[in-house]
Each structure stands twice: as C-alpha cells, then as structure tokens.
Regions:
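Canonical tetratricopeptide repeat
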Residues: 65, 99-100, 146, 153, ...
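Start-of-helix register in tetratricopeptide repeats
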Residues: 25-26, 59-61, 68, 95-96, ...
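Flexible helix-coil transition and linker loops at the boundaries of alpha-helical arrays
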Residues: 51-60, 87-94, 124-144
Length: 194
C-alpha cells in the first residue's frame, strides 16, 4: 500500500472540514500544505492550533492532521494517541483511520490493540458504514489495497499473539481472496508448522 497516497488523502480530507472562522481554515490549509511539503514542525504547529478550537469537529480534524504528521515521522505512539483523540473528539470514522491506528499499534508491538483496530476497520468496510474510501479513491483501488493490507496484518497480529488457529484460519481466508500473494503463501506454510 502506498502510505504516502494515504497520507495525502487524509490531509485533503482534513481540508474538507467545514470551517467558519478564517483562522481555523488557515490553520487547516497551512497544516496540510506543510505536511505535503514535509515541513513537519510547521504542520504540527498548525494542527495543534486546530486542536484548540472549541468546535469539536474542527478540533477532531486537528487531531487527525496531527496524527498524520506524527505517522509520517514514524512517531507511532504519538500518532496513535492523536488518532484516539480524533476519534474521541468526533472525527468522521473511516476504514482508513482504523487501518492507520492498527499499523501504529503494530509498530509499537501492541498486537491486541492492533487487532481490535484492524477488525473494527474491516467491519466498517464490510458494512460500508463510512463510505469515505469509495468516494475518495480512484475507482476504489486504494480502498481495495487497504482492505488487503488490513487482512494481511490481521494474520500477522494473530501470529504475534501466538493464536495459531486464528492465524491459520485468517491466512486461509486471505489466500482464497488473494491467491497470488506469495508472501502470504509462505506465511501460511509457516503457520502449518505450528
């Protein structure tokens, strides 16, 4: 999955939030521009301003932008904290957010939490609760790749938790859906030895 594309998508979504106060709009726009330019210090400053807004939607978008800034810098613990605050504050919940939360938890080796986020994102995708991915991706390709990544990571989480039966089952289901994935074929072979 091209995570850079995912980051830009999330940043663009941040700009789409309705803003009334020009200061808020400027912070969102400046934060997105700084993030896209790789100026993480400036992006962080702008998104932090946005988190201080009294309007919960604006504040939530600030936390999401802040999370993306941390994520891009591979500060996964801080990114996960910011994503949690975004969700708690009322950001529009999408499969993408739960995928990124799952990746952050995996990077910090909290596989139980990662599994919860991944499964929440997959459930959301299956019931099409968010609908955001289809609207915001070119012909759904990005969304399909993200779902595949999440299913792969679900197997990895079960493996890291030494839950061999669930890992085997999910690997088998994955290979039915994605039969040409040689990495998962090797993973499934390994799991059969457990």
């Amino acid at each position: 999955m091209k995570i850079k594309k995912q980051i830009v998508l999330a940043a663009v979504l941040c700009m789409a939030v309705p803003t009334v106060a020009s200061g808020c709009a400027n912070s969102a726009k400046s934060g997105v521009e700084a993030l896209e330019a790789g100026d993480y210090k400036e992006a962080q400053a702008q998104f932090e301003k946005l988190t201080e807004e009294k309007d919960k939607k604006k504040s939530a978008e600030g936390y999401r932008g802040l999370a993306m800034t941390y994520y891009e810098q591979e500060e996964y613990s801080s990114a996960l904290d910011a994503f949690k605050k975004a969700v708690d504050t009322g950001v529009v919940q999408t499969t993408q957010i739960y995928n990124l939360m799952g990746v952050c938890a995996m990077k910090t080796e909290d596989y139980e939490a990662a599994l919860e986020y991944i499964q929440a994102g997959l459930a959301m995708a299956e019931t099409d609760m968010s609908g955001e991915e289809e609207k915001n991706s070119e012909n759904g390709k990005d969304s399909a790749e993200m779902i595949q990544e999440m299913r792969y990571n679900e197997v990895v989480c079960y493996e890291k938790l030494a839950d061999w039966e669930n890992a085997k089952q999910k690997a088998s289901e994955y290979l039915i859906e994605y039969p040409k994935d040689t990495a998962m074929e090797r993973e499934a072979e390994f799991l059969e030895t457990r």
